[in-house]
């Protein structure tokens, strides 16, 4: 927006610092609004999805997974990174099935979050899924996680008490609370009547 011109930095050049199996790190030289130059180091990311799976009994699908950088087991909503050329919903459908064994008949896009704006361009699309059917998980090699269910009230209590500190799951809990309270509306689509794979998030 034009009123933000006094805040915006202009990219001048880029140096690649690391291209690993998981991380792609670059250093940009930028022109700041005051005319001085500065460097910005950050992670390039293809994007990711998070799935809030709603069971017919009102419970939600969650995972417990060890996160090496944190050196602890985290409670999280199912989530995963976009494959090259993959659209958001197809990724959500794939990740839900692979990690939890659930497939969903109805899907709704909720919104998008940027979890680490200071050092990554990653965004996470938030998807709700309902009318779930449980099948067999298809975990990747080297992927270890437990799937469990909880009530929304239990999840909120864990967020308040500090048992849940994963940022995307905290945001997901906020979305869940507002959707169930009728404050935020979702547009549900029936995957059985009209396959959604191939559609992207708005």
Over which residues does each language-model region extend?
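Hydrophobic residues on conserved beta-strands that form the core of alpha/beta folds
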Residues: 25-27, 39, 63, 77, ...
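Acidic, metal-coordinating catalytic segment for phosphate/diphosphate chemistry
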Residues: 12-50, 56
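Charged phosphate-binding loop/patch that engages nucleotide di/tri-phosphates or the phosphate backbone
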Residues: 172-190, 194
């Amino acid at each position: 927006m034009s009123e933000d011109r006094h805040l915006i930095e202009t990219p001048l050049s880029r140096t690649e610092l690391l291209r690993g199996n998981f991380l792609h790190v670059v250093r940009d030289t930028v022109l700041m609004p005051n005319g001085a130059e500065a460097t910005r180091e950050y992670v390039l990311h293809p994007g990711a999805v998070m799935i809030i799976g709603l069971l017919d009994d009102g419970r939600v699908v969650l995972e417990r997974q060890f996160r090496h950088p944190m050196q602890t087991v985290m409670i999280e909503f199912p989530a995963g990174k976009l494959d090259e050329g993959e659209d958001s919903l197809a990724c959500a459908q794939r990740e839900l099935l692979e990690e939890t064994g659930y497939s969903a008949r109805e899907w709704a896009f909720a919104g998008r979050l940027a979890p680490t704006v200071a050092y990554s361009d990653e965004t996470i699309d938030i998807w709700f899924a309902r009318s779930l059917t449980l099948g067999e998980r298809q975990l990747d090699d080297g992927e270890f996680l437990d799937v469990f269910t909880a009530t929304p009230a239990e999840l909120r209590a864990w967020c308040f008490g500090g048992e849940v500190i994963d940022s995307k799951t905290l945001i997901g809990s906020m979305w869940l609370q507002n959707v169930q309270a009728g404050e935020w509306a979702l547009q549900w689509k029936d995957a059985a009547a009209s396959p959604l794979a191939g559609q992207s998030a708005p």
